[in-house]
């Protein structure tokens, strides 16, 4: 089923506490040959508003950043509320490169949402991970989220 509204369950995942910080989302971009390229982002690398505006951080020289600069089509996949959601966005690079490591900010607007569900099964989790050094990662994540929230508000 397609819609243009951000599901509350998706907003709940992206608003998860950084204290657990174990949720990942998948992004898909299109490379120069037309093939899909996937990457994982932590919840500290994406901010989504209820109005369908998104801001993400990618390593500046990553394939995803290169693809978005060229094409601007972004698919974000999130497991939430017992389902999987594909959110399509049109994005562009926005603002200066963040340093250490160099990261690019992309902002954009929601184009469509596709909900994937099966009557015979419930999705119980998406991709999860464990931080090896949360004490060194979490302060950076807090700074990233502050930057992304500011970027998405300006968009």
Locations of regions flagged by a protein language model:
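Binding-site signature for planar aromatic cofactors or substrates
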Residues: 1-155
């Amino acid at each position: 089923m397609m819609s243009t509204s951000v599901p509350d369950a998706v907003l709940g995942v992206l608003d998860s506490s950084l204290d657990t910080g174990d949720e990942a989302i998948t992004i898909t971009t299109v490379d120069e040959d037309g093939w899909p390229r996937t990457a994982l982002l932590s919840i500290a690398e994406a901010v989504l508003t209820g109005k369908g505006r998104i801001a993400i951080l990618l390593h500046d020289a990553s394939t995803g950043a290169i693809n978005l600069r060229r094409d601007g089509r972004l698919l974000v996949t999130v497991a939430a509320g017992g389902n999987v959601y594909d959110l399509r966005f049109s994005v562009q690079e926005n603002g200066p490169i963040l340093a250490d490591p160099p990261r690019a900010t992309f902002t954009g607007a929601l184009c469509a949402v596709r909900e994937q569900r099966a009557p015979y099964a419930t999705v119980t989790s998406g991709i999860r991970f464990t931080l090896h050094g949360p004490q060194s990662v979490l302060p950076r994540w807090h700074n990233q989220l502050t930057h992304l929230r500011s970027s998405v508000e300006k968009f």
